[in-house]
Design a protein with these regions (language model features):
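Amphipathic alpha-helical "coupling" segments that flank catalytic cores
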Residues: 1-241
Length: 241
């Protein structure tokens, strides 16, 4: 139902009505009002200041349609280049990112991509699963970086946050990056950086002087005071969040 309006002469004459007209068609056929709204909104967002879908059916349909298009184009190797994006795939990717972040949804992007690839292959469109998935993840990651840059997140924070976490949970990455971005401009943020650099330099000096190997696994049995135990517990509590 969400694409039937593409066959109408009215949408052929006025392409900007696609989706909107589909919502009216769905309403005329007796579909639930939330379904009609989802059909009318599934192309959103269509611009920088465009509204985004907010209701569950609308979010689900908008994301499904966008990931289906992205997987399809990447599957047949019609990817955007640095100078050309004839199918507006960057806009689709940014649209997905905005829908997820502004609705505060935790969605595993890689699972969506792989499921869409599976559906294509079931229709005998045998895309290269690994290459298509990898290329699309990289593409979405780049769009996500651009989104954060437009939100005035520092470039070093963008790079560190996207390299430290899996792209599957962009909401988690964005929240952490935004928190760090806000904190780092304050006195407490500068203090944290100073402490981290000091500790890091001490470790590097000890490694170089004594030819040590540093493990990333702490041994609580070696702790000598309560400060170490409390710090260890706090780090683990934060990691669970």
């Amino acid at each position: 139902i969400c694409k039937t309006d593409l066959l109408s002469d009215l949408v052929g004459e006025f392409p900007e009505l696609q989706g909107v007209l589909g919502g009216y068609f769905a309403e005329a056929q007796g579909f639930d009002k939330d379904i009609c709204l989802a059909v009318s909104e599934h192309y959103l967002p269509i611009g920088t200041d465009s509204q985004i879908p907010k209701k569950p059916y609308s979010i689900a349909l908008a994301l499904s349609d966008k990931i289906d298009s992205l997987v399809g184009f990447f599957g047949i190797n019609l990817k955007p280049t640095s100078s050309k994006d004839p199918y507006a795939l960057r806009r689709l990717a940014i649209g997905m990112i905005k829908i997820i972040l502004e609705n505060r949804k935790t969605i595993k992007l890689r699972d969506l991509i792989n499921y869409s690839l599976q559906l294509y292959n079931e229709q005998n469109l045998n895309f290269n699963l690994e290459n298509t998935s990898t290329d699309l993840v990289v593409f979405l990651k780049d769009r996500f970086k651009n989104y954060m840059k437009e939100k005035n997140v520092r470039q070093d924070i963008i790079e560190s946050s996207t390299s430290s976490y899996n792209i599957d949970d962009i909401l988690k990455i964005y929240k952490k990056a935004n928190t760090l971005n806000n904190m780092i401009s304050k006195d407490i943020g500068l203090d944290v950086i100073f402490i981290y650099k000091r500790a890091s330099n001490i470790l590097i000096d000890e490694i170089n002087k004594n030819n040590l190997e540093i493990s990333d696994i702490a041994d609580p049995g070696l702790f000598k005071n309560d400060f170490e135990k409390k710090l260890y517990k706090k780090i683990h509590d934060i990691r669970k969040e």
